[in-house]
Amino acid sequence: MSPTLAELSEAELLKRLARFAPPDQLSDDTAALPSDRRPLLINTDVIVDGIHFSDATTTPTDVGWRAVAANLSDLAASGAVEIEGITVALVAPGRTSWDWVDGVYQGISAALGQYGGILLGGDCSKGEQRLLSITALGRLGPLRLHRNAARPGDVLVTS
C-alpha cells in the first residue's frame, strides 16, 4: 500500500519527486535560470489556512506580508540581490469576504514596497480552503548560495 503524504517527511517527498526533474534541480528552495543579465532565481512557497495562518492569530494584512516575506527570504538566502517581482495564486471559498482579500493584497503590497519588486500577475480560484501560492523572481548577486553546500565550520548568520 502506498504511504500517505502525512506519513512521508518533506525530505522523502522531495526525494520521490526528484525523478520528475533534472538531477539536483529539487535540492534547493530556488532554481537559477541563465540569462544575458545575472541569472534569474525563482522560488515558490504556499501558505495554507489552518496550517500557516488563521483568523484567530493572523490579520489578512499579515497573511499577505508573511507570504511575500517567506519567498523573498528564500531568494536572499540563495544570493539574490535584486527582486524582480512576484506572482500570486489565491484560492478561497466563495464565502471569503472581499475585505479579507483586500487586506491580504495590502500586506503583499506593503512587503513589496519595503523589500522591492512588483506584483507581476497571478491567478485566483475558488476552493474549499484559503491558500496563497507565491512565486518570486530575483537576480543573483556575485555569490550563489546552496543550502546543500554548507560544510562544518562555515559561518551562519541570521537576522
Model-found features: residue ranges?
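Extreme N-terminal cap/leader segments of soluble proteins
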Residues: 1-59, 88, 107-112, 116, ...
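Glycine-rich anion-binding loops of enzyme active sites
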Residues: 37, 82-159
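Glycine-rich anion/phosphate-binding loops
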Residues: 24, 56-72, 95-106
